């Protein structure tokens, strides 16, 4: 399910389930927040027991979202390289996802050089 606002920002419901659990990530994706210098995404995760319906947790979902996205990037990078060597990476955009991506990529690449670019170059300098 997706709700699109008048400004073009959106809310998304991302459900999942297993034999014993049902869960949902509810995420607000507000690209317009970039101009306000506030985070562009905000997420929460709810987990329920499928046998009783009881909620088991309600947790902040931003860290998990960042870690999952960065882990996916690292696994894809490792697969694409298939044993080839590289020691340079570049980030186009230096926001909330940059640090988790660097941390996960360092697990699969022997990084020697990092290039940074952002529309707001002060963000690239601050990250460096």
PLM regions: where:
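Active-site-adjacent beta-strand anchor residues
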Residues: 59, 91, 117
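Short glycine/serine- and small hydrophobic-enriched flexible loop segments
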Residues: 75-79
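Short helix-loop-beta connector
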Residues: 81-88, 110
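Glycine-rich Rossmann-fold phosphate-binding loop(s) that bind the pyrophosphate
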Residues: 93-95
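N-terminal Rossmann-fold NAD(P) dinucleotide-binding loop
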Residues: 98-99
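N-terminal ligand-binding/catalytic initiation module
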Residues: 1-66, 72-74
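NAD(P)-binding Rossmann-fold cofactor-contacting core
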Residues: 107-128
């Amino acid at each position: 399910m997706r709700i699109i606002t008048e400004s073009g920002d959106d809310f998304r419901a991302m459900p999942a389930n297993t034999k014993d659990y049902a869960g949902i990530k509810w995420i607000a994706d507000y690209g317009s927040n970039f101009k306000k210098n506030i985070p562009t995404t905000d997420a929460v995760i709810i987990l329920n027991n499928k046998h009783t319906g009881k909620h088991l947790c309600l947790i902040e979902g931003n860290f998990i979202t960042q870690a999952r996205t960065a882990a996916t990037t690292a696994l894809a990078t490792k697969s694409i390289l298939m044993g080839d060597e590289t020691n340079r990476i570049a980030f186009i955009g230096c926001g909330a996802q940059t640090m988790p991506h660097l941390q996960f990529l360092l697990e699969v690449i022997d990084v020697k050089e990092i290039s940074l670019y952002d529309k707001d170059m002060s963000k690239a300098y601050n990250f460096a």
